[in-house]
Amino acid sequence: QYVVNIQHGILDVLRKTGYELVVHPCDRKSDTFIEDARRFIEVQKLYGVILTPSVSEDERLAEVMRELGCAYIRIASIALDMERRMIVTNDRTGGREAARHLAKLGHKRIAVLVGRRSFRSSHERRAGFEEGLAEYGISLPAEYVLQGDYTFESGLALGSQILDLDPAPTAVFASNDEMAAGVLQALH
């Protein structure tokens, strides 16, 4: 949903410009990922590319853009490129604010669903969350940090793990909406 929302925003802007949005799904796990992206850009003769997470984090892809002379913007949790080529999200701040909110509500035992370690957003959200908890003197035990992969299915699976935690958490912080929806279904 995150990327779809970005696409809707881009479409709103492009309607006034005469440019079109071309969406090309990428499989970062593929051995031919970089070559496939290069070929697509060359064949389509793209004016510019907006790289969304997690492909935006791949420096090899940014290098291909520079080699081809293709304008690009990277959306990521931290600055990975020149300022004019970056949109930096506030993942750490969002995690911190979520922790503060839950702490103000009186929660001290909070389960945290994180995304893949390879995703910078997952690291930033967790770091911010832990910083927010620390402001209230709350620690995050390792057994309350559950590894997912930003999918509904992983949230569903982690929901059953949450039910096995003893003592049970009084709140859950999911690192993205898909895992949150999955854990909500599992806990209901």
Each language-model region and where it sits:
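Intrinsically disordered, low-complexity polar regions and short flexible loop motifs
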Residues: 49
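Bacterial carbohydrate/catabolite-sensing allosteric modules
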Residues: 5-23, 42-45, 59-60, 66-188
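Short beta->alpha connector loops
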Residues: 27-31, 52-57, 178
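A short, glycine/small-residue-rich beta-strand->loop->alpha-helix junction that serves as a flexible
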Residues: 2
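Glycine-rich, highly charged phosphate/nucleotide-binding loops
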Residues: 30-36, 96
